[in-house]
Each structure stands twice: as C-alpha cells, then as structure tokens.
Amino acid sequence: MRRLFTSESVTEGHPDKMCDQISDAILDAILTKDPNARVACETCTTTGLVMVMGEISTNCYVDIPKVVRETVREIGYDRAKYGFDCDTCSVMTTIDEQSADIAMGVDEALESKKGQKDEVEAVGAGDQGMMFGFATNETDAYMPLPIYMAHKLSRRLTEVRKDGTLDYLRPDGKTQVTVEYENNKPKRIDTIVISTQHGEEVSLEKIEKDIKEYVINAVVPTELLDSETRYFINPTGRFVVGGPQGDSGLTGRKIIVDTYGGYGRHGGGAFSGKDSTKVDRSAAYAARWVAKNLVAAGIADKLEIQLAYAIGVAKPVSIEIETFGTGKMPEDKIVEIVENVFDLRPGAIIRDLDLRKPIFKQTAAYGHFGRTDLDLPWERLNKIEEIKKYI
C-alpha cells in the first residue's frame, strides 16, 4: 500500500519560534539561579515589539529585557533592514506570581496529604491533561522520517545563513517534507518545500540553485531523492518581509513542529516557558523517553504512549499503549512493563531526567525529540536492559 505523509519545520527566526526561544531563555536564566522556581512564561511579538507575560514564583532576580534582547540577537534580528532589531525593539513585561490555588496542589500532592510521605509523592501534577510520547525505528533517531528531514533542512538553512555561505538569507524560514511510504516503510521523498526570508538584492533563480546545492543536497540522502521528487523553493516568488514584521508570533503555537510532525498524537499542551512541575512539558518528555526505550528494546517497531494526570495528584490517572500492529506482545503487558520500569510521578520524572537544570532554550527550535545534536536526558537509551528482563 502506497501513502504520502507530510511534516513541517521552521527556523529559529520564525516569529512563533522566536517567542518559544525567548520564553525558554527566561526559564533557563531563572533556573540557573533558582532551580526550584515556578515559571509559566509566555511571549508574543509583532513589528518592533516583544511582550513577556505570565506567572513566575522565584527568589532570584533576572533582567528579562536583557535576556529578550540577547536571544533576539542570537537568532539574527540585529538590524532594522531585517525587519526587527534587538537593540531598538520595545520590550514589555507583565509578570505575576503563581496562583496560590495551583501552588498548594504542586507543593504537596494528594497522596502526600493522605499520609504517603516521600520526596516524590510531595510533588503533585501542575495541571490536569494528557500527554503523548512516540517512537519509531524508521530512523536512527527513532523519529518519523518526515519531521526528522524537515528539521535537518531548517537547521541547515540557519547554518548556511550564520556561517556566511548564503549571506543573503535572513532568519525567518520554513521547510516541509512529504515522504512516500510503501507497506508502512519510508521509500522516497516525494516533495520538499522550502521558504526562506532573503535580502532584496537576490534573484529567485539564485535562491533556488543555492538552496538545492547548499541545503537540500547537503542533508538529504541521495537514495531518498529521484527524478520524480518535486521541489518548491520560495514558491510565492519573494520573501523579503519576514519575522515579526511579516507575522505576529506567540509562544506555544508550533506544538506539532516541536514533537512528531503530526505522525504521533498530541495532548495539546505546549512546552516552552514552563518549568518541569508542569506535566505538559515534563510528562511529554517522559513519554518520549518511555516510547523510545521500548522501541529500542524491540517491544514494537512503532509505539505511542498516552499519560494522563489530575492536578495536584502525583500518580498518572491512566497509561495507554498503542503499537499500530507492530507490537511483539499484548499492549496491556507493555503497560505492565512501563509501570514496573518507569516511575511517572512528576517528582520522579524531574529527578530521573534531571529537569531542574537550565537545559531548555536549546530545545526551543528544531524539535524537542530526536535531537542527535544534543544530549537530552529523555533521549537516552538507558532502560533497555531493564525492559528486556520482562520480555
């Protein structure tokens, strides 16, 4: 059976991704000084303006406007002709403390209030909700090929801009990859779409030629391309106005780019700007950790796990496994393995994945999962042998 599946990525200069990076840069700056801080930091941006808002409870001081400007500078918006200037943009902040009603459930979980006293039980989930984790063995990164290749292309777009290879490129950009599957195995790349912001002086013909040579051919394996592969490079013909000048940006608006490109399900909660007591983030990371280790252990070729939590309660209210017909054992047995091998209470997730550290800004562009360029705790294959004891 033949089918097509498409996923997209965006560069760090995309306005939504700018906001994700600013929110996580602020989170990291706070965690560096106060690892136990509670942070829920949202950012929005438009022409000449960055606004930071949210709820932050901490005992430290962070110069938020300075963090904002440094982050925007690193992305590459450092002069007016790019449509946004880190030195002259306006930065507004409006920050409150975390609600006392929420804090009381996170500070002491329901289990702890009922007498189950230990350090892990003391941390309740920061909200209700469901989170999904996914892994597949179709790539070495245990990620679906469409999102994996889309991220590689968007990262390469930024590399050739920053190292001067294509110095006419600007920070904003998007990529999209359509993969043809045959019998549920990736066979070839059917379509590649790349839209990149550029200087006014360069022709579309040069952009098309350079993007194929320095971006696509540099990262896409030749065996995945053929004479039928279609390329759409800046298909509107012009992309000079970009970044916050072209579109407003908002934290948490690229949640599918952040995860599995639509190949796996998503619970709806965004990651950036949230400390690890927020299960939207920490439990989604744990779910990826579980799924990746299960697939690497040979439990299934493709696996998705759903976790669900109640606010103020430590233990998940449900765990569900889907193997899409690739499992080597019944799914209820896999759930038992998960319960025996992984402690999925928020306090245990924070402990086992070391999530009090300021490691989040680096995840805020090019995906939180399958990052072979980073050493992220939830990507480590450190539970395989323990899982195999139950097979």
Curated annotation (Swiss-Prot):
One of its GO terms (biological process) is S-adenosylmethionine biosynthetic process. GO terms for cellular component: cytoplasm. SUPFAM superfamilies: S-adenosylmethionine synthetase (SSF55973). Pathway: Amino-acid biosynthesis; S-adenosyl-L-methionine biosynthesis; S-adenosyl-L-methionine from L-methionine: step 1/1. It comes from the Bacteria. It catalyses: L-methionine + ATP + H2O = S-adenosyl-L-methionine + phosphate + diphosphate. It is found in: Cytoplasm. Residues 98-108 are annotated as: Flexible loop. Binds 2 divalent ions per subunit. Binds 1 potassium ion per subunit. Catalyzes the formation of S-adenosylmethionine (AdoMet) from methionine and ATP. The overall synthetic reaction is composed of two sequential steps, AdoMet formation and the subsequent tripolyphosphate hydrolysis which occurs prior to release of AdoMet from the enzyme. Homotetramer; dimer of dimers. PANTHER family: S-ADENOSYLMETHIONINE SYNTHETASE (PTHR11964). This is S-adenosylmethionine synthase. It comes from Clostridium botulinum (strain Eklund 17B / Type B).
